[in-house]
Amino acid sequence: MNMFKKHKYLIIRNAISFELANFAFNYFLMKRDATEWMHKNNYVSEFTPGFGTWKDQQVPNTYSVYGDTFMETLMMKVLPVMEKHTELKLLPTYTYTRAYKKGDVLKRHKDRPSCQISTTVHLGGK
């Protein structure tokens, strides 16, 4: 029996290479740092779309971005891996990326209806 259908979740190790995960991790930290600098120096408003925010209510004071182009591309790369392991034809909808820091907690929650099946990818940590 398909493990995803039986347990309603899967752990897939090495869904992407270490090198790609490390690249994505460092990209996102650099984007966070650049966005912080641009906010502090008034180059962009905290409300300018695409740069990210520290105002997500689920994990306050933690940098997050909805629909980052690189992460959307990564989602499409992981799609065939997810379809293979779930044995489902999946429709990608969106990405949401957070740079968790020590002490952050994401409490159990329900995602929006368009997110019937989610993928969480650990890209790295310090």
Give a label for each model feature.
Residues 1-86:
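Non-heme Fe(II)/2-oxoglutarate
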Residues 9-11, 96, 118-122:
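Conserved hydrophobic/aromatic beta-strand scaffold that supports enzyme active sites
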Residues 84-88, 122-123:
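Short hydrophobic alpha-helical module
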Residues 87-96:
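A short coil-to-beta-strand element that immediately follows conserved catalytic motifs
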Residues 99:
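Conserved active-site beta-strand element of glycosyltransferases/polysaccharide synthases
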Residues 102-126:
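Catalytic core of non-heme Fe(II) oxygenases with the double-stranded beta-helix
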